[in-house]
């Protein structure tokens, strides 16, 4: 296929429109398997040519309410079909192949077909591609004699791979699954990349993604890190890492770490050094090539284009000879297959079978993946995306529940048996007498697997039926850890393992991690520890371990440890029911089970004890804290008491104590000193780090918070407190009763599922697990405070649970980070909170919350979670990354989970991570994550921003008086929270609206949706702003609201407030039930920075109705609560009841207000969205914003307004979206607001006013009207991005030099006095019209082969072929493809380097002074220039230079105030909507008036916007009006309480961004969501 163009550029949006393959292609035998379907040998029936046909199931499901077809942009487009996740990936792969397969290193794509099947069967999608007869690189390596390719062949293949990747990366596509199986070879040694099922377009801001996807062994560290830390991101350089791993695969026959389980490999890749080839027979160039490819920090890793210049792939000697020799080798492989009768396959038959059941997995980093998770998938860090595939090969087949439970308990017995064997083994085994001490210690702690395979089955364990289900989960969690211990250095312990089994273990081939291992899924399956080659009988023997073998394998080292660990009466008699199962269950069940969670102090995850410099292993301090192997076992066994004494001890005890046993164990694990021999530290590093990671996964209190509360004995028992205590006792009884029920294993298998453990998630209280055996004193005499009495062993081994309230202690880390923590309590003014441990629902909700990005890990740690630790002499406190769910950057922490401030056990809420069009953008240096003392306030980029924390004392006093709240004022302003009572509203919890790339309209003349509307083309990142009306366009506009009137409304009797809050959080009735809210209780909320509130306190919603609406509005405005019943609240105004005041950073106090429920009208108005999240604000840290998690109901039509908390000290004049982030131009600076997760404000350009800005991402340009002379300046986006990311002095110096030499910024023709500009992208040319005081200048960025005369006519010459396609991204593709194909030197140049700026024409405007200008293609396919003036609207033909006036309604007494020229996206670029005064009309570009007055605004709007859902929005003096373009009716009106200036900035999809100017000339940014496109299409004929 020669190149792009024509059908390639039209994106496939409806699979049903593809042709039928019958009569064109026929299928032969199966030759391979792709990600989602089989690959067949296809035969073109007319020519007899062979092809590869990928056949996949595809089904379309009609939505009943909008299951119809409509006409959009001349094309029939289905709006009534919704595709599944798998089918969306198929469409992605199909469109990527259509666009980019013209490259010689991408498999050629011949077409796609849709084969209809009979009713009841799924239809089939056929993708016909080039046949690569030699198979994949993996197959070629396996068919080679020594399973290794020659170095020259590797260099050639790597070069071809890099060329294909450079082609994809130039088009902003990340492959994300480069491996040997996805690199195919033809019979003549051509290299082709295949399998684009997981490829993705990168972010438009800085080209990054953060979804967790790929094949584990080839996965780059930054991709793995995105699963553990979604604040991270990666870019196309992750493919370069995969190329390096593929090179190792070609050199050694398998990728590194292929002998590990996939999850283990993920841990090792992220934490170990970069892999390399083991053999030393390779050249230095090859080693250097792999080192460059596998640089762990992707910011320093070369790109694919740079790697092509590496000598290893650039200087291939005798390339022709290399290709010929490789061709001969491939021909021999093909003939060898034919001789052996092996069919032409791309992968081995076993791999086909495995990959058919084992598919890729994805972590929940992408919001659209999280939304589809079932409710039973609670707290799974990794999930299967596509359906429920068959079990992977490391899991056995499902068996009967009784048999499976038996195997699970036997697995648990093997895990904990080493400790039991210590009590009963009389002497060490003779064969192990010579074994080093470390091997014996390892054998005790991790029972080797192979030692059990040949073990003689003596008597099966008898206690499995009586053990609680959590024990089986503990066994499943620890099984992979047990599998890790298979290593060559334990051969003396593993003498029973046959060489055949070892060979099978070593040669187990790599696999896609297509399904999550069982311990992360919570499914009731036993992890299969044997590799795929083992026989079923060996697996059966593996599940039954005799007690004698266990005793023989455990050699006691110190008798005193045995004596301390022995049970007086039961140690010898419990061989059948090992006591270690019961005892250690107390330790590992709370830590490791999936459904039973006990809080671990934060310092175990955020601090490790590291020996101070100069401290050696031999020093007394270090020796005192270094465990010998028996002591390590003792520490594990000491975890029993450690939980009850250390972790769950009363946090209000003020005496400091030595490090507890669990802290000691974690300290040793964290410092990689589990054994005392320092020379073995490197060898054990991977295993210990893997163990540490697995423990941290289970120990990390991701979904829970430690909350402080009053001691009950210190309180007077009021009615509310008495109710709470009764509820507490009731839940204690339920908890213990449910504990007894859980231990009945003989019930149905469903007892093992999460349904049986719902109470564990719904109970909020501190759990105290009482030990069932006396505490074994620590060998090093580490003192541990006794908290709960020891209980002798009983037959049932019940874990009794007590509920108590306690006050956590300040920790060392809390004191160290005092300036950073915003809620830490001073020791003098420590306040306590009331316990609120109640729950009224047993319904589980999936934990889908993820943390937001771009935040240093220690910026907002909740210090209340920390428990005191004692740091011994000679140690310092080191830091590692904290768990995400313990930081306030996590979205979920700012909302529902905060209601459980007083609880240790807290169910996590249903909260989605921030997402903007599926792309995450990270705008901070990755090295900032490692800084431990990040005080984000010390950043001079926030000069014009500050947190709104002023002048709230009076407001607080008013709230205190209105609510009768007894409050203890401190230095800081205290905050209150309104608790919204949702029991009256039965709105279901709705899934989040998938706005994404539904479209963006044209602003500023920059086309987002001309011609073929961008709303339906999937490219939604073209955004721009329009500055309306001239230099004083919005000077007379009014402001939004004032604190005095607002405070009066807050004091209404129907609102409740509480002391330690910020803004109220609204929940659905389902979520409220899960949290146990009722009308008698008010719960404290602490909200995060970012969106200060849904801004409903400034805007009131008015729905047009015959009467009643205005009265309700007046009632709200006057501060009186409306008396309408609750069911009428949807027809009333909305007003928020929360305050603007900051909450206290040092203390909190309970409130005794009588108004417990918030305004019902406000709740009703917001509840349609399902959930509106108001994160927490902080005066100490940059704001964290969560703008996207809106769950919009399909029935909702009311707009939502959200406000960003940051205020700007100068007026915001313009804005434009750059990717997901917002560029804001003020009267003094240019800022970037990071909307990806935190509302960080970065100052990009100082001391220069900006009047209008617009981002042109395809051209890598930012066009501005800026400066005091209103010059037209063009900035390079690359320079701005480097200004954000690179803060080192050398980079800053380089940036200043670029600015001086006009490499970063250039003034176009030194034009001054610019009023407005507009951009139109069409084909290869980008036009820009600039309005000056008396003329309009027309410029164009065109290919360097164009001149002025060609550029002005290119529209006419090519419009007939384009059929109205003005998609700028398609033009960008054409620019690259055509210009780069013409000259290979241009292959990797940026688009702006391939174009030149042409000055086309200057059009005098005679006596008309232009105010706004716009560009369009007229009905005669000619370029038209619209501009407005005080005299009306005018039209200029660009080619003939003829100017004419647009007909307006004649009213000689009226002065025309022009606002906007809006290109209507559904009119193929011909239709215009002209807005002026309080009217709007639509005209065609051929001067014909085809509609009369379209709309009549109630007031003259300052600015008007048109968005993709066919609605116009006007910002007037008194209200914001939303009108339908089709029905011409006023859909909604949001009134403002006081006058503020409003100015429209930009739009994306149905999100409209605008700004308001406050009375003190400060500005604030809002965005408004109007509703879903599908809902409007069901109501209007779009």
UniProtKB/Swiss-Prot annotation:
InterPro entries associated with the record: CNH_dom, Kinase-like_dom_sf, Prot_kinase_dom, Protein_kinase_ATP_BS, Ser/Thr_kinase_AS, STE20_Ser-Thr_kinase
Region listing for Disordered, in residue ranges: 492-579, 783-859, 926-1156
Record's keyword terms, sorted: ATP-binding, Coiled coil, Kinase, Nucleotide-binding, Phosphoprotein, Serine/threonine-protein kinase, Transferase
Composition bias type Low complexity, residue spans: 492-507, 527-538, 551-572
Protein name: Nik-related protein kinase
Pfam families, per database record: CNH (PF00780), Pkinase (PF00069)
Annotated organism of origin: Homo sapiens
Annotated catalytic residues: 177 (proton acceptor)
GO molecular function annotation: ATP binding; protein kinase activity; protein serine kinase activity; protein serine/threonine kinase activity
Annotated GO biological process: positive regulation of JNK cascade
Described purpose of this protein according to its UniProt entry: May phosphorylate cofilin-1 and induce actin polymerization through this process, during the late stages of embryogenesis. Involved in the TNF-alpha-induced signaling pathway.
Residue numbers binding ATP: 31-39, 54
Acidic residues bias spans: 926-944
Keyword Kinase tagged: yes
Residues in coiled coil: 725-759
Biased composition (Basic and acidic residues): 965-978, 999-1016, 1043-1061, 1125-1135
Gene: NRK
């Amino acid at each position: 296929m020669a190149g792009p163009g024509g059908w390639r550029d039209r994106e496939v949006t409806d699979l049903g429109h593809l042709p039928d393959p019958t009569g064109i292609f026929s299928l032969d035998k199966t030759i391979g398997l792709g990600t989602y379907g089989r690959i067949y040998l296809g035969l073109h029936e007319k020519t007899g040519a062979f092809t590869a046909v990928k056949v996949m199931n595809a089904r379309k499901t009609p939505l009943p309410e909008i299951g119809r077809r409509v006409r959009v942009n001349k094309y029939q487009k289905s709006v009534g079909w919704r595709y599944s996740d798998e089918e969306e990936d198929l469409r992605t792969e199909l469109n990527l192949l259509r666009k980019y397969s013209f490259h010689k290193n991408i498999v050629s794509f011949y077409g796609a077909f849709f084969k209809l099947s009979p009713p009841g069967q799924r239809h089939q999608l056929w993708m016909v591609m080039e046949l690569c007869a030699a198979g994949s690189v993996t197959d070629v390596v396996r068919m080679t004699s020594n399973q290794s390719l020659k170095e020259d062949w590797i260099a050639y293949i790597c070069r071809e791979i890099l060329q294909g990747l450079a082609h994809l990366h130039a088009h902003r596509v990340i492959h994300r699954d480069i491996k040997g199986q996805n690199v195919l070879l033809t019979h003549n040694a051509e290299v082709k990349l295949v399998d684009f099922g997981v490829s993705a377009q990168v972010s438009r801001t800085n080209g990054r993604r953060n979804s967790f996807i790929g094949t584990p062994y080839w996965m780059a560290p930054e991709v793995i890190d995105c699963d553990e830390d979604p604040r991270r991101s990666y870019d196309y350089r992750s493919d370069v890492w995969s190329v390096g791993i593929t090179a190792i695969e070609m050199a050694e026959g398998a990728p590194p770490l292929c002998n590990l389980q996939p999850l283990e490999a993920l841990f090792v890749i992220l934490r170990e050094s970069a892999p390399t080839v083991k053999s030393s027979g390779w050249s230095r160039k090859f080693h250097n090539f792999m080192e460059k490819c596998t640089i762990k920090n992707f910011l320093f890793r070369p790109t694919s284009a740079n790697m092509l210049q590496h000598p290893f792939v650039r200087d291939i000697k005798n390339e022709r000879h290399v290709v010929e020799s490789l061709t001969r080798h491939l021909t021999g492989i093909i003939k060898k297959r034919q001789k052996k009768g092996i069919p032409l396959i791309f992968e081995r038959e076993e791999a086909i079978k495995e990959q058919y059941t084992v598919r890729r997995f994805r972590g929940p980093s992408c919001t659209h993946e999280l939304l589809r998770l079932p409710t039973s998938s609670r707290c799974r860090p990794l999930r299967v995306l596509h359906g429920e595939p068959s079990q992977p090969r490391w899991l056995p087949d499902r068996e009967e529940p009784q048999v499976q439970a038996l195997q699970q308990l036997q697995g648990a017995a093997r895990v904990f048996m080493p400790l039991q064997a210590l009590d009963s083994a009389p002497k060490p085994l003779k064969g192990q007498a010579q074994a080093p001490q470390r091997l014996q210690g390892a054998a005790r702690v991790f029972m080797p697997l192979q030692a059990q395979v040949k073990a003689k089955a003596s008597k099966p364990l008898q206690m499995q039926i009586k053990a609680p289900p959590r024990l089986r989960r503990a066994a499943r969690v620890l099984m992979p850890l047990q599998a890790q211990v298979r290593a060559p250095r334990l051969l003396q312990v593993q003498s029973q393992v046959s060489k055949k089994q070892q060979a099978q273990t070593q040669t187990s081939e790599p696999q896609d991690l297509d399904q999550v291992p069982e311990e992360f899924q919570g499914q009731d399956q036993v992890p299969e520890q044997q590799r795929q080659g083992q026989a079923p009988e060996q697996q059966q023997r593996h599940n039954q371990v005799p007690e004698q073998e266990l005793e023989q394998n455990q050699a006691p080292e110190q008798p005193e440890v045995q004596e301390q660990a022995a049970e007086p009466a039961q140690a010898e008699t419990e061989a059948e029911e090992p006591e270690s199962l019961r005892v250690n269950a107390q330790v590992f069940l709370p830590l490791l089970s999936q459904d039973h969670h006990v809080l671990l102090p934060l310092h175990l995850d955020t601090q490790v004890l590291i020996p101070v410099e100069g401290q050696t292993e031999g020093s007394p301090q270090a020796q005192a804290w270094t465990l010998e192997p028996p002591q390590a076992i003792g520490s594990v066994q000491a975890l029993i008491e450690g939980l009850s004494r250390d972790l769950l001890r009363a946090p209000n005890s003020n005496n400091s104590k030595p490090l507890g046993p669990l802290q000691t164990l974690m300290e040793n694990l964290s410092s990689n000193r589990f054994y005392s021999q320092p020379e073995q530290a490197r060898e054990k590093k991977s295993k210990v780090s893997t163990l540490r990671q697995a423990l941290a996964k289970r120990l990390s209190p991701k979904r829970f918070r430690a909350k402080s509360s009053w001691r009950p004995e210190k309180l007077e028992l009021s009615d509310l407190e008495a109710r709470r205590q009764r509820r507490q006792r009731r839940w204690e009884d339920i908890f213990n009763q449910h504990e007894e029920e859980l231990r009945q294993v003989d019930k149905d298998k469903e007892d093992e599922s999460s349904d049986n453990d719902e109470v564990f998630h719904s109970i909020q209280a501190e759990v105290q697990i009482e030990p069932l055996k006396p505490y074994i004193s620590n060998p090093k005499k580490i003192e541990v405070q006794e908290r709960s009495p020891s209980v002798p062993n009983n037959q049932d081994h019940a874990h009794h649970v007590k509920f108590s309230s306690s006050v956590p202690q300040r920790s060392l880390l809390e004191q160290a980070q005092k300036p950073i923590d915003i809620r830490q309590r001073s020791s003098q003014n420590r306040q306590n909170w009331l316990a609120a441990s109640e729950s009224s629902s047993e319904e589980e909700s999936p934990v889908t919350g993820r943390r937001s990005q771009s935040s240093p890990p220690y910026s907002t740690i909740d210090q209340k979670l920390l428990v005191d630790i004692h740091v011994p002499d000679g140690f310092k406190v080191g830091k590692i990354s904290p768990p995400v769910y313990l930081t306030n950057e996590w979205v979920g922490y700012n909302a529902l989970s905060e209601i459980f401030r007083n609880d240790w056990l807290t169910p996590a809420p249903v909260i989605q991570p921030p997402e903007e069009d599926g792309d995450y953008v990270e705008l901070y240096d990755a090295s900032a994550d490692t800084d431990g003392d990040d005080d984000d306030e010390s950043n001079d980029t926030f000069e014009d921003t500050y947190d709104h924390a002023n002048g709230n004392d009076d407001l607080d006093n008013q709230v205190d008086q209105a609510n009768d709240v007894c409050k203890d004022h401190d230095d800081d302003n205290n905050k209150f929270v309104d608790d919204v009572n949702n029991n009256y509203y039965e709105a279901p919890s709705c899934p989040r609206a998938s706005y994404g790339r539904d479209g963006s309209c044209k602003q500023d003349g920059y086309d987002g949706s001309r011609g073929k509307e961008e709303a339906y083309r999937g490219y939604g990142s073209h955004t721009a702003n329009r500055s309306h009306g001239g230099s004083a366009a919005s000077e007379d506009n009014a402001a939004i609201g004032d604190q005095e009137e607002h405070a009066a409304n807050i004091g209404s009797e129907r609102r409740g407030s509480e002391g330690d809050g910020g803004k109220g959080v609204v929940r659905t009735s389902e979520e409220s039930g899960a949290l146990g809210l009722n009308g008698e209780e008010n719960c404290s909320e602490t909200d995060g920075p970012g969106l200060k509130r849904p801004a409903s306190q400034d805007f009131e919603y008015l729905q047009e109705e015959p009467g009643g609406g205005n009265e309700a509005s007046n009632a709200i405005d006057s501060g009186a609560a409306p008396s309408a019943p609750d069911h009428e609240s949807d027809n009333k105004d909305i007003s928020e009841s929360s305050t603007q005041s900051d909450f206290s950073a040092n203390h909190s106090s309970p409130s005794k207000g009588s108004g417990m429920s918030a305004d019902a009208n406000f709740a009703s108005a917001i509840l349609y969205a399902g959930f509106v999240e108001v994160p927490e604000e902080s005066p100490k840290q940059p704001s964290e914003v969560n703008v996207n998690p809106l769950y919009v109901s399909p029935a909702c039509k009311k707009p939502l307004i959200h406000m960003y908390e940051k205020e700007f000290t100068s007026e915001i004049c313009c804005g434009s979206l750059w990717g997901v982030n917002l560029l804001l131009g003020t009267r003094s600076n240019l800022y970037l607001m990071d909307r990806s997760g935190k509302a960080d404000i970065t100052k990009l350009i100082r001391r220069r006013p900006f009047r209008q800005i617009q981002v042109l991402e395809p051209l890598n340009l930012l066009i501005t009207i800026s400066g005091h002379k209103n010059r037209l300046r063009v900035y390079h986006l690359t320079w701005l991005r480097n200004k954000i990311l690179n803060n080192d002095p050398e980079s800053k110096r380089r940036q200043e030099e670029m600015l001086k030499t006009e490499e970063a910024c250039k003034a176009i023709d030194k034009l001054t006095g610019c009023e407005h500009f507009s951009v139109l992208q069409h084909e290869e040319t980008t036009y820009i019209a600039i309005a000056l005081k008396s003329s309009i200048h027309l410029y164009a960025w065109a290919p360097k082969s164009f001149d002025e005369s060609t550029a002005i006519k290119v529209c006419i010459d090519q419009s007939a072929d384009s059929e109205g396609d003005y998609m700028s991204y398609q033009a960008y593709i054409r620019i690259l493809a055509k210009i780069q194909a013409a000259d290979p030197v241009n292959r990797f140049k940026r688009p702006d380097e391939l174009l030149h700026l042409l000055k086309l024409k200057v059009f005098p405007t005679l006596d008309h002074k232009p105010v706004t200008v716009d560009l369009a293609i007229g009905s005669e396919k000619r370029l038209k220039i619209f501009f407005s003036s005080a005299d009306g609207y005018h039209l200029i033909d660009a080619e003939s230079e003829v100017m004419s006036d647009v007909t307006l309604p004649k009213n000689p007494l009226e002065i025309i105030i022009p606002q906007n020229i809006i290109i209507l996206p559904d009119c193929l670029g011909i239709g215009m909507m002209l807005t002026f005064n309080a009217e709007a009309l639509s005209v065609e570009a051929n001067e014909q008036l085809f509609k009369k007055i379209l709309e009549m605004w109630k007031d003259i709007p300052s600015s008007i916007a048109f968005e993709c859902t066919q609605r116009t929005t006007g910002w007037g003096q008194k209200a914001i009006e939303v009108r339908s373009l089709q029905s011409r009716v006023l859909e909604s009106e949001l009134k403002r309480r006081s006058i503020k200036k409003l100015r429209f900035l930009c739009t994306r999809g149905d999100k409209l961004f605008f700004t308001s100017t406050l009375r003190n000339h400060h500005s604030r940014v809002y965005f408004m969501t109007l509703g879903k496109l599908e809902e409007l299409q069901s109501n209007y004929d779009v």
